[in-house]
């Protein structure tokens, strides 16, 4: 619930990725329900702000019909897996950050945790997904991935601790999931 008594609706976008059809569905919902603010979040999602309580069931029904599910933006648990474009699109990318991020988010979605958990996968040491200030961060390097833990980007910024190095996507998933 927002400070004016309206609600925020944040559909999940696995690894920060979306499609033209999903974007059209979000735009259609914003138009149909006269949602006053549509904002891209720091977690690479789209937040529909100012949704009236009585519209929530219909908003979610329309989004669900388009294949969109809740991003659990305010839940205690897995928030998002932020990704950079990685080796698919970036000239510096050494690893497939988007692919690994989507796998990781799907694997962990619905997990219960005592507090919010933010994750990121960067495709190279340039760290465009800000993996070193997340609870769990994975950074692509030439020989695989570095696994990082215990970062924070809130009031008390803290860089992660390096846990170690793994060679493959599967090993990265095994170590963090």
Where are these regions (language model features)?
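Intrinsically disordered, low-complexity polar/charged tails and linkers
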Residues: 1-6, 18
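Mobile "lid/hinge" segments at catalytic clefts and subdomain interfaces of large enzymes
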Residues: 118, 123, 127, 132-177
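Small-residue-enriched alpha-helical segments and adjacent helix-cap loops
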Residues: 9-142
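Short, flexible, solvent-exposed loop/turn segments with mixed acidic/basic and small polar residues
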Residues: 1-3, 34-40, 153
């Amino acid at each position: 619930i927002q400070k004016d008594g309206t609600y925020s609706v944040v559909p999940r976008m696995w690894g920060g990725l979306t499609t033209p059809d999903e974007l059209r569905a979000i735009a259609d919902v914003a138009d149909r329900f006269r949602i006053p603010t549509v904002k891209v979040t720091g977690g690479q999602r789209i937040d529909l702000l100012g949704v009236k309580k009585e519209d929530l069931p219909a908003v979610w029904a329309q989004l669900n019909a388009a294949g969109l599910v809740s991003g659990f933006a305010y839940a205690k648990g897995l928030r998002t897996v932020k990704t950079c474009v990685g080796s698919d699109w970036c000239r510096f990318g050494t690893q497939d950050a988007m692919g690994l991020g989507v796998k990781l988010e799907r694997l962990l979605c619905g997990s219960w945790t005592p507090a919010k958990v933010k994750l990121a996968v960067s495709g190279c040491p340039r760290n465009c997904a800000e993996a070193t200030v997340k609870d769990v961060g994975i950074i692509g390097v030439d020989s695989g991935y570095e696994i990082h833990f215990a970062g924070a980007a809130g009031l008390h910024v803290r860089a992660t601790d390096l846990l170690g190095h793994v060679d493959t996507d599967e090993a990265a998933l095994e170590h963090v999931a």
